[in-house]
Curated annotation (Swiss-Prot), chain A:
CDD domains according to UniProt: Prefoldin_alpha_GimC (cd23160)
InterPro entries in alphabetical order: PFD_alpha_archaea, Prefoldin, Prefoldin_subunit_alpha
GO molecular function, a single term: unfolded protein binding
A cellular component term, taken from the record's GO annotations: cytoplasm
Stated role: Molecular chaperone capable of stabilizing a range of proteins. Seems to fulfill an ATP-independent, HSP70-like function in archaeal de novo protein folding.
Assembly mode: Heterohexamer of two alpha and four beta subunits.
Family under the similarity heading: Belongs to the prefoldin subunit alpha family.
Subcellular location: Cytoplasm
NCBIfam families given in the database record: prefoldin subunit alpha
Protein name, as recorded: Prefoldin subunit alpha
Pfam families linked to this entry: Prefoldin
Source organism per UniProt: Pyrobaculum arsenaticum (strain DSM 13514 / JCM 11321 / PZ6)
Alphabetized UniProt keyword annotations: Chaperone, Cytoplasm
Single GO biological process annotation from the record: protein folding
From Swiss-Prot, chain B:
CDD domains with a match to the protein in the record: Prefoldin_beta_GimC
GO process annotations (BP): chaperone-mediated protein complex assembly; protein folding
Annotated function: Molecular chaperone capable of stabilizing a range of proteins. Seems to fulfill an ATP-independent, HSP70-like function in archaeal de novo protein folding.
GO terms for cellular component: cytoplasm; prefoldin complex
Protein name stated in the entry: Prefoldin subunit beta
GO MF assignments: protein-folding chaperone binding; unfolded protein binding
Superkingdom classification of source: Archaea
Chaperone recorded as keyword: yes
UniProt-listed Pfam families: Prefoldin_2
Amino acid sequence: MSRQDVRQEIQRLIEEYQLVGELLTNLQAQHATVSELLEELTTALDGVRLLKGGAGERLVHIGAGLFVKGVFETKEVLTPLGAGYHAFLDLDNAERVLQERIEEYSRLKTSLEENIGKLAERAEQIRQVLERLGIR
Amino acid sequence: MAQIPPSLQDMVNRFNQAQAQLQSVLLRKQQYEAELKEVDKAISEIEKLSPDAKIFKNVGNFLVPQTRDAALQELKERKELLELHVKTLSRQETMLREQLDKLRDEINKELARLKGGEAAKGGG
């Protein structure tokens, strides 16, 4: 391999390393967003399940650690169906919709984690090769 | 380093341009497909509801009441439009991929020709 070939290969590896880094940053941002959404959906699901426990007094969080007493006799909740539409669904159906969405986002999260793992592995491989070639 | 002939430079420029176009087309197609999936989900949920169900549509910061039939009609129209967009973009994608394959072949042929010419010069 000529010196010029080595130089070109190093250049190619550096470019790939930068590209992999950008992709990783992008996927990690997506992962954070999906994790946040999952947390929100899980909280909502817990709320619906709590309401299914029947009517009665509940303590409701209104932010900053403040709670108020509330009496709930709800049979339906206004549920997002997607594409900007909402409908009043009974608690069982609201739970089903939330559960489906949680499953969907969980699959997405798993897939993102797999891709992040593969990219991180590739970045490490390139880093090691560049290090052996004396580039840090 | 030898100067790149203008004809080859032109091919490379066209290749890069087509590649950028393809990336843009794929991104738009992905966005429409995601929206289509969301619309499909909403349709399937609304179809499960009774005809007199209380449905609301998001309009800015407001939730506006709407009948089940009106919601379904609006969503189905939106679905048709999205499918049309996806179809159009898929056609563009196919054309651009063919264009890229053709340009790649032309560039490789030109490079091989140039290498052959250099080898002949070196041997002479």
